[in-house]
Amino acid sequence: MSARQAGFTSEAPPPRSARAALVVLAAVLGLAACASHERATKKKDDASTYNTQLGIAYLRQGDVPLAKEKLDRALRENPGNPEVHSARAMLFDRMGEPAKADAEYRAALRLAPQDPDVSNNYAVYLCQIGRTDEGVHRFEAVARNALYRTPWVAYSNAGVCLRSAKRNAEAARNFKQALLTRPNFAEAAYQLGDLEFQGGNLTDARAQVDTYIGAFEATPDLLLLGVRVARAQGDRLAVEHYARKLRLDFPSSAQTHALAELDHN
């Protein structure tokens, strides 16, 4: 008895060309679904990045509640974004919640262990809360990271961290390392010169100022430092030289205003 005679329906398999078309259609549908998923994921990632940037902007403006709202949303949109966690760490630091801030920095590091910017941000935080050795260690690791394009900044940051802890000899070594790496890095030159000045080493401080501005473009900080050092040395001609250049080159700077206050003292 045939299948049709027994009451069952039976269809012949589609021809080979039809089967091939079905396979192609299935593949196309699979690719379309994958592409759709990728687009949705990218949309969420883009939204997370956008809200992170907004959150940071609001935080800089001092609007902590709105910053938190944006960063909470960014986290929901992409919990695997290390930039979100770094931003939330800054938020919690501002809110006076150090445990949460530290946890967020560590989350960012777990997600991006080789990202020097993430490590640099954490190092800044560690120095600010007095964990100097940890902060300096991270700054120096960042400086050695081949992915970090400005190692002189990391060395200088390590110096600032050490200086804030009154570890001046170690700070000076880091400022010098920054200048070896980038001789025209004005911030390190200023920090080293000011460190010498505060330590009473007027000759070394003056040499630091003159060496830098003799080779590179002067900055307001270095010129004002030159004024202060020359005044301490009793060198009136040098005082007038630095002061004139500061007034002419940077008339609206905060350092020029500070110079006016010095003149009244």
Where are these regions (language model features)?
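Bacterial Sec signal peptide processing site at the extreme N-terminus
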Residues: 28-50
